[in-house]
């Protein structure tokens, strides 16, 4: 034993001696050994035990090093690598924080100047008021500001306008020319994209943003000047004239057309001067403002479809940062001529929050997105480049905007659709689906059926999220299959379809998203199976390319969209797209604004009359603010390819389908409204039915009256809302059905919805007989007379069927009549209620 220990010490001593340099200091590895280890580390930073042993055998200069030592070397090497990366990251973060701190200090200085200015103005106004009160002989004198007349047709005049635009823009971006207030819901912080503000008490609507972007100033300016690439509402932008300004800058005359967000108002266009220059401090500026005069552009007929809007001094101030990157200030200041839209839409055109979300915030987010992509921070699946996916999103959005606006110069013309006065139907015979490889094309085009609706008390983000996640609640699979089949044929001809059953399953496959997840691009696969016996094993799946935006409920003024188009399962980059979808825009209603959409110049459909989600007339005065302040405009547009000889048939199908979608949206809106069907808030369950709280009381009271026992254990001090909550959370499945010849369910508690595997929206399509098997239906029929005579009936244990086809067993079912507690009539039968006790899936 002693000999073994001595041998081990001798080997250790020899090993250490081999790693002493000429000065006697301990050196763990020689330069040759380190070089060999570095080569292996470059190939595999974390080699396994077998790989390390193999390394010792293959590399003779490492033969005298123990495997454990090599393991420790690789561990230390990985730690040093991690430390270097972390140090580099911290330096980058420190630079960003320093730049952000500088930005915040400047913002603080600007706010202090603004406060001082307001204090001075307040003191001056008090002094003037005192003078007027004390000196009644004082006459007010109105002075009109005098502007020097400049010739906008000469370079000298344009340069004068450009310099004035620059001064006005800088005073808005970094000064106090506009009274800025923080954008609601966009509190600045470490995780924020930037600092956002909107105007208060100024001419028009304005928004401002400033933030840090890891791109060079020239690159940022180039991106932002290409407005159609990031501003989804920009239809076209054309530079008519460009000439040097003489000071190193450039002056451009620009004509821009924008889309209208709904079918209810005309689109806007702008005729502007854009001035690009650099400042003495190294900053880069792009500023822009409207010019007087028509400046209609190359096509006067096209310009006649637009209302000329005004752009007040706006633009971008881009300052380089130490260590790379830039600080950017963005100002958008517009006058959208709200007088030209229906009263119900005016708040949309007078909202700085909407301009902030659509333009200012979108611009900064887009720049940040490109910066992250260029730095390799964004990785997308399916091998798609970010630029390709971004192009798909832009094409979907542009195609939907084209359909909603239906510009004549794009080939759109309006046709009449019999029996659908609330739906606009337009056709476009200039659109072609066939690609270059398919030389055969049929005469036809694309038909669009569209409508706009006013909804109340429906959060746009919640509505769009529901439509995305529950497509089967509103969509017809056969219509999707029709569009997909037409797309595969590569022409307008309808190739024919075999009978297909939709399985009810949709699979959403994400492709990419923006940095803050405000927009998602995805492929949706709708699973279908042929009903024909010879094709029983063939897949009839339908694939849709889809973008979903604005599902953040906290984004004030944000537009929510769900836009989709059928696409080939091979998903080629140049795939033709015929988009359809939904757009929901919040409208900040003003008190006293009661003008509804029927006064609009365009045909529309007002769902509010049938939703009945507002307060009752006797309570309207107490809730006037809530009933008028939460409104949104829903725009629906669906496009269908057609062949000329089938135009009328496709138009009829399109009208019928859009009407069906509208009806489904109506039910969805009723269900998801915060003042709709909810355990905590009373509401109308359906047109003509009582409020949820009242119905819960009727169900409980009628049960006690007929069976002599309590359905719910209610505290003597419990409120009316607690009755609804107890009913909603009851362990037994409780359902109510109407007294029509074919009873249809109108309400169910949570257990009832779970048992039927359905939602409150789809519940109203389920009849009573659908949920029972044959024996259950016989039991209902045999006890129905008893139920109607004595007011209740107890059904034996049995089996019922969920909407998904699953069997559900229950120990007992109790049915009873529900009476409406009315002062005039105590025997007012309202509906039938059922309670399924101890139910479970078989």
Swiss-Prot record:
Primary localization: nucleus
Known DNA-binding region: 22-85
Keywords: Coiled coil, Differentiation, DNA-binding, Homeobox, Nucleus, Transcription, Transcription regulation
Record annotation: effect of changing residue 190 to L: In avb1; gain of function. Transformation of the collateral vascular bundles into amphivasal bundles and disruption of the ring-like arrangement of vascular bundles in the stele
GO MF: DNA-binding transcription factor activity; lipid binding; transcription cis-regulatory region binding
Region entry Disordered, spans: 1-20
GO cellular-component term (any): nucleus
Disruption phenotype: Plants display strongly reduced auxin polar transport in inflorescence stems and hypocotyls. This phenotype is probably due to altered cell differentiation and morphology. Repression by miR165 suppresses DOF5.1 over-expression mediated upward-curling phenotype.
Alphabetical GO biological process terms: cell differentiation; determination of bilateral symmetry; meristem initiation; polarity specification of adaxial/abaxial axis; radial pattern formation; xylem and phloem pattern formation; xylem development
Domain START, chain residue ranges per copy: 151-379
InterPro entries, A to Z: HD, HD-Zip_III, Homeodomain-like_sf, MEKHLA, START-like_dom_sf, START_lipid-bd_dom
Compositionally biased spans, kind Basic and acidic residues: 7-20
Coiled-coil stretches: 90-121
Highest taxon listed in the record's lineage: Eukaryota
Localization: Nucleus
Effect listed in the UniProt record for changing residue 625 to S: In strain: cv. Br-0, cv. Ct-1, cv. Edi-0, cv. Ga-0, cv. Landsberg erecta, cv. Ll-0, cv. Lz-0, cv. Ms-0, cv. Sorbo, cv. Tu-1, cv. Wa-1 and cv. Wassilewskija
Residue stretches spanning the membrane: none
Pfam families: Homeodomain, MEKHLA, START
Induction context: By auxin. Repressed by ZPR and miR165. Induced by DOF5.1.
Gene3D superfamilies listed in its UniProt record: 3.30.530.20, Homeodomain-like (1.10.10.60)
Entry function: Probable transcription factor involved in the regulation of interfascicular fiber (cortical cells) and secondary xylem differentiation in the inflorescence stems. Required for lateral shoot meristems (LSMs) and flower meristems (FMs) initiation. May be involved in the determination of vascular patterning and organ polarity. Directly regulates the expression of AGO10, ZPR1, ZPR2, ZPR3 and ZPR4. Required to regulate adaxial-abaxial polarity and leaf axial patterning.
Subunit description: Homodimer. Heterodimer with ZPR1, ZPR2, ZPR3 or ZPR4. Interacts with ESR1 and ESR2. Interacts with ZPR1, ZPR2, ZPR3 and ZPR4. Heterodimerization with ZPR3 prevents DNA binding by REV.
Similarity comment: Belongs to the HD-ZIP homeobox family. Class III subfamily.
UniProt protein name: Homeobox-leucine zipper protein REVOLUTA
Species in which this protein is naturally found: Arabidopsis thaliana
Gene name linked to the record: REV
């Amino acid at each position: 034993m002693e000999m073994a220990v001595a041998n081990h010490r001798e080997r250790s001593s020899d090993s250490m001696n081999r790693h002493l340099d000429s000065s006697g200091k301990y050196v763990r590895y020689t330069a040759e050994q380190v070089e060999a280890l570095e080569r292996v580390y470059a190939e595999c930073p974390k080699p396994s035990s077998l790989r390390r042993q193999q390394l010792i055998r293959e590399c003779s200069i490492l033969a005298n090093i123990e495997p454990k030592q090599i393991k420790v070397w690789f561990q230390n090497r990985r730690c040093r690598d991690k430390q270097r990366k972390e140090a580099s990251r911290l330096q980058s973060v420190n630079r960003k924080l320093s730049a952000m701190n500088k930005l915040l200090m400047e913002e603080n200085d600007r706010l202090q100047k603004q406060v001082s200015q307001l204090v001075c103005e307040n003191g001056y106004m008090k002094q003037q008021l005192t003078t007027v009160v004390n000196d009644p002989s004082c006459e007010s004198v109105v002075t009109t500001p005098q502007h020097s007349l400049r010739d906008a047709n000469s370079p000298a005049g344009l340069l004068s306008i450009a310099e004035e635009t620059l001064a006005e823009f800088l005073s808005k971006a970094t000064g106090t020319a506009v009274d800025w207030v923080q954008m609601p819901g966009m509190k600045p912080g470490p995780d924020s994209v930037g600092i956002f503000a909107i105007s208060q008490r100024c001419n028009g609507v304005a928004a401002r943003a400033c933030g840090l972007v890891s791109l060079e100033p020239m690159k940022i300016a180039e991106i932002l000047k290409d407005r159609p690439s990031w501003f989804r509402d920009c239809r076209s932008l054309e530079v008519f004239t460009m000439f040097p300004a003489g000071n190193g800058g450039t002056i451009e005359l620009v004509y821009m057309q924008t889309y209208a967000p709904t079918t209810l108002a005309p689109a806007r266009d702008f005729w502007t001067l854009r001035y690009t220059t650099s400042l003495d401090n190294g900053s880069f500026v792009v500023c822009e403002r409207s010019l007087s005069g028509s400046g209609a552009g190359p096509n006067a007929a096209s310009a006649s479809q637009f209302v000329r809007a005004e752009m007040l001094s706006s633009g971008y101030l881009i300052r380089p940062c130490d260590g790379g990157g830039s600080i950017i200030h963005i100002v958008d200041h517009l006058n959208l001529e709200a007088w030209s839209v229906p009263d119900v839409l005016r708040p949309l055109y007078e909202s700085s929050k909407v301009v902030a979300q659509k333009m200012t915030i979108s611009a900064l987010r887009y720049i940040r997105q490109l910066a992250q992509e260029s730095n390799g921070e964004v990785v997308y699946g399916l091998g798609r480049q970010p630029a390709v996916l971004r192009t798909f999103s832009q094409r979907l959005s542009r195609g939907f905007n084209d359909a909603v606006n239906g510009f004549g110069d794009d080939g759109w013309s309006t046709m009449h659709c019999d029996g659908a006065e609330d739906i606009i139907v337009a056709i476009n015979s200039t659109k072609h689906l066939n690609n270059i490889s398919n030389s055969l094309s049929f005469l036809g085009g694309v038909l669009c059926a569209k409508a706009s609706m006013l909804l109340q008390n429906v959060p746009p983000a919640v509505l769009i999220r529901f439509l995305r996640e529950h497509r089967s609640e509103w969509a017809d699979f056969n219509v999707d299959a029709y569009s997909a089949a037409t797309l595969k044929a590569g022409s307008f001809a309808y190739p024919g379809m075999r009978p297909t059953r939709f399985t009810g399953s949709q699979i959403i496959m994400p492709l990419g998203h923006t940095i803050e997840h405000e927009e998602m691009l995805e492929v949706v696969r709708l699973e279908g199976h042929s009903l024909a016996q010879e094709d029983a094993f063939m897949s009839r799946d339908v694939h849709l390319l889809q973008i979903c935006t604005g599902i953040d409920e906290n984004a004030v003024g944000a537009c929510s969209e769900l836009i989709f188009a059928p696409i080939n399962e091979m998903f080629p980059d140049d795939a033709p797209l015929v988009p359809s979808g939904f757009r929901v825009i919040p409208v900040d209603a003003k008190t006293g604004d009661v003008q509804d959409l029927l006064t609009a110049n365009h045909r529309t459909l007002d769902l509010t009359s049938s939703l009945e989600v507002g307060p009752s007339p006797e309570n309207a005065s107490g809730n006037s603010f809530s009933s008028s302040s939460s409104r949104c405009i829903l725009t629906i547009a669906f496009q269908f390819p057609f062949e000329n000889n089938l135009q009328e048939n496709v138009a009829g199908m399109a009208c019928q389908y859009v009407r069906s979608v509208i009806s489904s949206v109506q039910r969805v809106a009723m269900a998801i409204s915060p003042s709709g069907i909810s355990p905590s808030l009373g509401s109308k369950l359906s047109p003509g039915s009582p409020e949820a709280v009242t119905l819960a009381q009727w169900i409980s009271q009628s049960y006690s009256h007929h069976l002599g026992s309590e359905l719910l254990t209610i505290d003597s001090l419990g409120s009316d809302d607690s009755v609804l909550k107890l009913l909603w959370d009851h362990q037994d499945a409780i359902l109510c059905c109407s007294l029509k010849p074919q009873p249809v369910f109108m309400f169910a508690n949570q257990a009832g919805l779970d048992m039927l595997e359905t939602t409150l929206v789809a519940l109203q399509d389920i009849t009573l007989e659908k949920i029972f098997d044959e024996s259950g239906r016989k039991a209902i029929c045999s006890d129905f007379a008893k139920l109607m005579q004595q007011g209740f009936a107890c059904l034996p244990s049995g089996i019922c069927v969920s909407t998904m086809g699953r069997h559900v067993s229950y120990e007992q079912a109790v049915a009873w009549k529900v009476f409406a507690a009315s002062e005039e009539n105590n025997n007012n039968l309202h509906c039938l209620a059922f309670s399924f006790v101890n139910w479970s899936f078989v």
